[in-house]
Each structure stands twice: as C-alpha cells, then as structure tokens.
Amino acid sequence: MDKKILVVDDEKPIADILEFNLRKEGYEVHCAHDGNEAVEMVEELQPDLILLDIMLPNKDGVEVCREVRKKYDMPIIMLTAKDSEIDKVIGLEIGADDYVTKPFSTRELLARVKANLRRQLTTAPAEEEPSSNEIHIGSLVIFPDAYVVSKRDETIELTHREFELLHYLAKHIGQVMTREHLLQTVWGYDYFGDVRTVDVTVRRLREKIEDNPSHPNWIVTRRGVGYYLRNPEQD
C-alpha cells in the first residue's frame, strides 16, 4: 500500500509542486490549505507523514503540530522560512521530527521524506508485551519492542524521535557520539540535516528524564564533541 502524505501549505503553487513530486515517487498525497482543515484531515486520513508549513491561516503550523502530537506519532516535517531560526526551534520543541527551509530543493525534500518514513517503518513498536531485550540503566528502563520508557516505575511519554535517540544512546552507554553521527544514525540522513535538530531533541529528552534538566546527569555533553548516556545512580 502506498504511504499517505498530507501536505499542509496555504500557498497553492507550493502545495501543487509538492504533490506532483511526491506522487511521482509513488506516494498517495492529500493537501490541506489551512490549519483547521489540516487537523480534520489528520483525523480522517491518519497519514504516514505530514509536511506542515508554519504560516497558515486560521491555525498556524505550531498549533496544528501540538494538536496532532496529542494523539498521533507520525513523522512531521515543518516547512519554515529560510532565516527563521526561531520557527525551526519551536517546531522541534513541540514535537516535529524535522524541518525544511524554503526555498527547498526537491532532492533534499524527498530525501528527508524517505528518511523519516524509513525510520518510522523500521522502528515501529510491536503489538506485544515487552520482551527480554529491555535495557536497564539504573531506574531507567527501555522496552524496545513496546516503545516504552519508564523511570522509577513511572512511564515517560516520548515522541518517536526522542525514543529513538535515547534507545541508541542506551545501546552505546558511555560512548560519546558526535551530533553528526547521531544525525546519520538516528535520523537516517546521509548528507542532509542540521545538527541543531540533535541539540533540540536532546534538550527535550533531558526535560523528560532528568531530575534537574538544567544540570543533566543522564545525558551528558562532552564539550566540543557530542553527547553520551551514563548511569548517575552508580556514582
């Protein structure tokens, strides 16, 4: 079955170009042109991926992303203005998986769409009870099969990308990973991507698993190199 992609952009020429190129790649494409319509179509279609413009009438892309994330975990790629760093950060902070800046190349956009769909496909949670391959790091427990994380027996709600990042760091506990390496392995980008995406996702993760996110003890920064996961409860 073709993957369903929802394109949300109030500029019809851009939406038409996106639809044309995505259909050429074999995707089933639907378009929405304002925020309210986008939310309704997400409920109706439950697409496999959303391309979401920040600037929309009625309800902007940030609010749409917030509403979608309350119920769904499909990849969301934000479409942002070229120089709008704040839009990029806000989009990632509220749960978007990635962003593409306008004007964008078709090659870059398709690469990001494929990478996000590939990660979603290969890491989809199983519909079964957690198995014995769970990872224990002190009071932090990761259940890869069920896509669940708990700390001190309390479930922690993570987005798809947050889980993937934490899981990867946990499998390589104590090893410092560069942002570029994490972008390639967790996000699946071979040549596209902004390492700021990694920084924002790490910050979101810290807010959820750290006792004091301002002074992280689990996900540690190695200045000038990258990040690594440790077990502070062993110290």
Swiss-Prot record:
Protein localization: Cytoplasm
So which domain of life are we looking at?
Bacteria
* UniProt keyword list: Cytoplasm, DNA-binding, Phosphoprotein, Transcription, Transcription regulation, Two-component regulatory system
What GO cellular component is one of the record's annotations? protein-DNA complex
Effect of substituting residue 53 to H: Constitutively active
Q: Which GO terms describe its biological process?
A: regulation of DNA-templated transcription
Q: Which residues form the Response regulatory domain?
A: 4-117
- Tell me the subunit arrangement: Homodimer.
State its role: Member of the two-component regulatory system WalK/WalR involved in the regulation of the ftsAZ operon, the yocH, ykvT, cwlO, lytE, ydjM, yjeA, yoeB genes and the tagAB and tagDEF operons. Binds to the ftsAZ P1 promoter sequence in vitro. WalR has been shown to directly bind to the regulatory regions of yocH, ykvT, tagAB/tagDEF. Activates cwlO, lytE and ydjM and represses yoeB and yjeA.
Q: Which residues carry this modification: 4-aspartylphosphate?
A: 53
User: Reported effect of changing residue 215 to P?
Assistant: In JH17041; thermosensitive; decrease in dimerization and DNA-binding
SUPFAM superfamilies given in the database record = C-terminal effector domain of the bipartite response regulators, CheY-like
Q: Which GO terms describe its molecular function?
A: phosphorelay response regulator activity; transcription cis-regulatory region binding
Name the source organism.
Bacillus subtilis (strain 168)
Matching InterPro entries, A to Z? CheY-like_superfamily, OmpR/PhoB-type_DNA-bd, Resp_reg_WalR, Sig_transdc_resp-reg_C-effctor, Sig_transdc_resp-reg_receiver, WalR-like, WH-like_DNA-bd_sf
Q: Which gene encodes it?
A: walR
In its record, the post-translational modification comment is:
Phosphorylated by WalK.
Checking SMART domains in the record gives: REC, Trans_reg_C
Which CDD domains does the entry link to? REC_OmpR_YycF-like (cd17614), trans_reg_C (cd00383)
- Identify the DNA-binding region of this protein by residue numbers: 132-231
Q: What is this protein called?
A: Transcriptional regulatory protein WalR
